[in-house]
Amino acid sequence: MGSQVSMDAGAVHVVIVGGGFGGIAAASQLQALNIPFVLVDMKDSFHHNVAALRASVESGFAKKTFISYSVTFKENFRQGLVVEIDLKNQTVLLEDGQALPFSHLILATGSTGLFPGKFNQVSSQQMAIQAYEDMVTQVQRSQSIVVVGGGSAGVEMAAEIKTEYPEKEVTLIHSKMALADTELLPCVRQEVKEILLRKGVQLLLSERVSNLEALPVNERRECIKVQTDKGTEVDANLVIVCNGIKINSAAYRSAFGDRLASNGALRVNEYLQVEGYSHIYAIGDCADVREPKMAYHASLHANVAVANIVNSMKQRPLKTYKPGSLTFLLAMGRNDGVGQISGFYVGRLMVRLAKSRDLLVSTSWKTMKQSPP
């Protein structure tokens, strides 16, 4: 797939909705193959959100996590919010009235969640970076911090704070007994707990925050009283919420209402085509594939979608996507981590080398063919 594809220039035009990990992987491959495409995103920069939590605690790190789309994709990038997909006329409609025609559509809308783990809003690169620098200030000014949610984002957030500021009091509150993602090996989840305890994180497990809606989030206060359903009360200066990830279905919900899974993801076949549409693909978090929602998987999906657009043009057999054994690395601060590769446990040294030190930031700059700041 390294060489350019010869074809009738007017026959194929791909629109990619969403410039996350799957979207930029697909766009980069189409660009290399000289296949006409447009990438649409409401931000002007790709957000390497794998490193969002470190950008919340380490001043100066955020600028490494936002990478301009237009520098890489030039006139093939449009900043805008998708408001409708017109299946009959094969166009993507933007909020500003632009209509983008497509022969093939790749939906890569990702998922949405609370800041700082996610940054999903219409924004410039400068504003986005400043939002994270402001968050660093809130963390620096707080002595006692509560992290709500003990999935992968919550445990990584707690670890990042204690790594950067070991003197701060950090309490992690999680509604279940086991930490991190349910798909992980029990020994990996246990090691996550051990790492947090070694770092001095206070754990409140099998407890749910009962007054969450009344709490100020991401804002330093003199005293915030966090209450749980077990009657525990924690005094904090800062509350950071790391749960509630949802599929970003707003762009396509009205067009594909009958093709949606219960969580809002699009039902796809083994070729990652949306059920009933051979020219429309869903990749990444918005594809209903039985595997954890991860940047790594989104990039694998992009490979399949682009290969199948090329294969369909050349009347070749389509490539199938089969989820493999789980590879999942948890960076617990820059010097620690744990995870599994192809279903096998890997410890601190391997995870530190593979992910924890720079959180794969350099990989995204390479994908975007730019040099990091």
UniProtKB/Swiss-Prot annotation:
Feature type site, description 4-hydroxy-2-nonenal adduction: H174
Activity regulation annotation text: The modification by 4-hydroxy-2-nonenal (HNE) adduction in mitochondria results in loss of the oxidoreductase activity and activation of a novel function in mitochondrial oxidative stress signaling.
EC primary class: oxidoreductase
Lipid group attachment sites (N-myristoyl glycine): G2
Cofactor requirement: 6-hydroxy-FAD
Entry keyword annotation includes Ubl conjugation: yes
Catalytic activity: ubiquinone-10 + NADH + H(+) = ubiquinol-10 + NAD(+); phylloquinone + NADH + H(+) = phylloquinol + NAD(+); menaquinone-4 + NADH + H(+) = menaquinol-4 + NAD(+); menadione + NADH + H(+) = menadiol + NAD(+)
GO cellular component: cytoplasm; cytosol; lipid droplet; mitochondrial membrane; mitochondrial outer membrane; mitochondrion; nucleus; plasma membrane
PTM: N-myristoylation at Gly-2 mediates the recruitment to lipid droplets and plasma membrane.
Cofactor notes: Binds 6-hydroxy-FAD non-covalently.
N6-acetyllysine PTM positions: K168
Transmembrane portions of the chain: 7-27
Location in the cell: Lipid droplet; Cell membrane; Cytoplasm; Mitochondrion membrane
Annotated SUPFAM superfamilies: FAD/NAD(P)-binding domain
Keyword Manganese: no
Residues the record lists as binding 6-hydroxy-FAD: G18, G19, G20, F21, G22, R54, V82, D285
Gene3D superfamilies on file: 3.50.50.100
Protein family: Belongs to the FAD-dependent oxidoreductase family.
The protein's role, per its UniProt record: A NAD(P)H-dependent oxidoreductase that acts as a key inhibitor of ferroptosis. At the plasma membrane, catalyzes reduction of coenzyme Q/ubiquinone-10 to ubiquinol-10, a lipophilic radical-trapping antioxidant that prevents lipid oxidative damage and consequently ferroptosis. Acts in parallel to GPX4 to suppress phospholipid peroxidation and ferroptosis. This anti-ferroptotic function is independent of cellular glutathione levels.
Name of the featured protein: Ferroptosis suppressor protein 1
Organism: Bos taurus
